[in-house]
Design a protein with these regions (language model features):
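C-terminal "cap" of GNAT-fold acetyltransferases
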Residues: 152-188
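Residue-level recognition of the GNAT/N-acetyltransferase active site
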Residues: 80-83, 126-128
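Conserved acetyl-CoA-binding loop-helix of GNAT-fold acetyltransferases
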Residues: 86-113
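Conserved beta-strand-loop-alpha-helix junction that forms the acyl-donor binding cleft
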Residues: 113, 121-141
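Short amphipathic alpha-helix that is part of the acyltransferase structural core
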Residues: 1-33
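Short, high-confidence coil segments that cap the C-terminus of an alpha-helix
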Residues: 43-44, 116-120
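A conserved beta-strand-loop-helix scaffold within acyl/acetyltransferase catalytic domains
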Residues: 26-82
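A structural microfeature
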Residues: 57, 76, 148, 153-154
Length: 188
């Protein structure tokens, strides 16, 4: 079973950090980057996703006042070590559109709940043609933009790199979760 837990110093993430490092997930391979990098934000929270009591993922949300006062950046530091879960792929584009993946079922709702559904929420992606965010920037944002879940807001220099900023339509997203219940047992 999945469970998402707010990060705290008592969590043993040694193996999670080690695996993230071995996979080149440099934003998730130690506490300094995953958690401490947000210490100067007005509000911040990191969560760890567990499957059968093993840490298998992470996500963060924080105030995004540098972009817009009172706004939040969500789905930061998103990572899933899917080889430790029964759900290893988003499957088809149609399944992805119906939110049959870990980010939609666990990470995004957790971030929305923490921020408040009426808050101004944004995700950021790296538009560079290389790097770990390439598929997120090209594929996922394309699907979510076509379905009205996100809207391109700007391209900005942020945290040392060019990033695309996307406004999240949290009301639409949460209503679609009700419309499309999880049909994969591995997402329940």
């Amino acid at each position: 079973m999945y469970k998402i837990t707010p990060w705290n110093e008592t969590l043993d993430l040694t193996d999670f950090y080690s695996e993230a490092d071995s996979k080149g997930l440099t934003n998730n391979n130690n506490q300094k980057i995953l958690v401490d990098s947000f210490r100067n934000e007005r509000e911040k929270q990191v969560w760890i996703l567990y499957y059968d009591d093993k840490p298998v993922g992470s996500v963060a949300a924080h105030s995004f006042d540098d972009y817009k006062p009172g706004a939040y950046r969500i789905l930061a530091r998103t990572c899933v070590l899917s080889h430790h879960t029964p759900f290893r792929s988003v499957g088809t584009i149609e399944a992805f559109k119906k939110h049959q993946h870990v980010t939609a079922r666990f990470f995004l709702p957790t971030c929305v709940e923490w921020c408040g559904i009426d808050s101004d929420m944004y995700i950021t992606t790296h538009p560079e043609p290389t790097g770990q965010m390439k598929s997120v920037h090209r594929l996922i944002t394309s699907v979510w933009q076509r379905t009205g879940l996100i809207e391109h807001s700007a391209d900005i220099e942020y945290r040392g790199s060019l990033q695309s900023v996307w406004r999240v339509n949290a009301h639409k997203f949460m209503s679609e979760l009700d419309q499309y219940p999880a049909y994969y047992k591995s997402l329940r």
